[in-house]
Structure formats: C-alpha cells, structure tokens
Amino acid sequence: MATKILIFLSFVALSSAGFVWVDDDNNSFPKLRQLYVPPLPQPPPLPNIPGLPQPPPLPQPPPLFGFDFSPILPIPPIPPIPPILPTPPFINIPAPEDIKNIKPKPGQFFNGISVKSRSGYALDKDGNRVKTGGTAVLINDNGEVNETIVGDNPPKFEESRKESSSN
C-alpha cells in the first residue's frame, strides 16, 4: 500500500514540476473580464442609544466574471422580409337584387347565382318540434332570371338587402 501511495505522489510531483504557482494580476485570459457589480445600499443609521451598538455595514457582493464580447463584430440588422403572398384585390360581391336586375348588352355575357337558406325548429299545433326552413336560389343566365324556392319557410332575397343594410 505504501508503494502505491509513493508511486502516486511521484506522478503528481513530476506532472506539476514545470508549473510555477505565481499570483499575478495581469490578464492571462484577456476575454475574461471582471463585471461591474453595484454596491449594496446601506441602511440608514440607527439613532444613537447609549449601550446599544450600531450594526456593522452590510457586506458587499463579490465581483462577477464574464466574457468580454466587445472585440467581436456587431451583428448587422436583418432587413425586412417582403410579404410572400400579394394582397388580394377587393372583390365587390353583388347583392341578389343586383344579380336579378343585370341585363347584358349585345356582345356581353353574364352568369350570376345567389343562394340563401335557413333552417330551424318550431313547435306545431300539437306541441311537437318540427324542422322548418328552406332554400331560395336565384339564377341569372345571360339576362334570363329563374328563381327557385324549396321548403316550408324559405328566406326571401329582399330580406338579405335589409340584413346587409342594418349591419
């Protein structure tokens, strides 16, 4: 056992024989700088009372060390990225009355369709829930207007103009 300890100590002595442990203040590692730590504020002094000692000042925090990145070049600002998709143009959607009243001139063509539907539940005379509603379809095929209504309580296209003007 003593032989193992002696061999171990000789390896330690040989490996550190070339190093001199000198305390020096020069910055052997220039990127490591001492960071500023502001001092702690001291409490106000207590009134002088005979027989009562004053408390000692608060201890100050130790200095912090960190890397100094000042020699590194600053990062340039990133230029703004243009939008990938273009802004779509404003589309004017005609009201059902507009579709109904369009009459194409000679050499022009127009096809328009408007669909409005509603569904709901109501109570019949016996108190049972009954599904109500319907659909109204307006088609203008080159000036020829066809209006189809399906269901027991379909919406009317005139109602759509009132709803859109009240919103």
Swiss-Prot record:
Signal peptide interval: 1-17
Tagged with keyword Ribosomal protein: no
Per UniProt, the keywords (alphabetical) are: Glycoprotein, Repeat, Secreted, Signal, Silk protein
List each coiled-coil range: none
The entry's cellular-component GO terms read:
extracellular region
Q: In which tissues is it expressed?
A: Produced by both the posterior (PSG) and middle (MSG) sections of silk glands.
Q: Region entry Disordered: which residue ranges?
A: 145-167
Acyltransferase in keyword set: no
Write out the annotated subcellular location: Secreted
Biased-composition ranges, Basic and acidic residues, are: 155-167
Task: Give glycosylation sites per the record.
Answer: 26, 146
> Which residue intervals correspond to the sequence repeats?
38-46, 56-64, 76-78, 79-81, 82-84
| Protein known as | Seroin
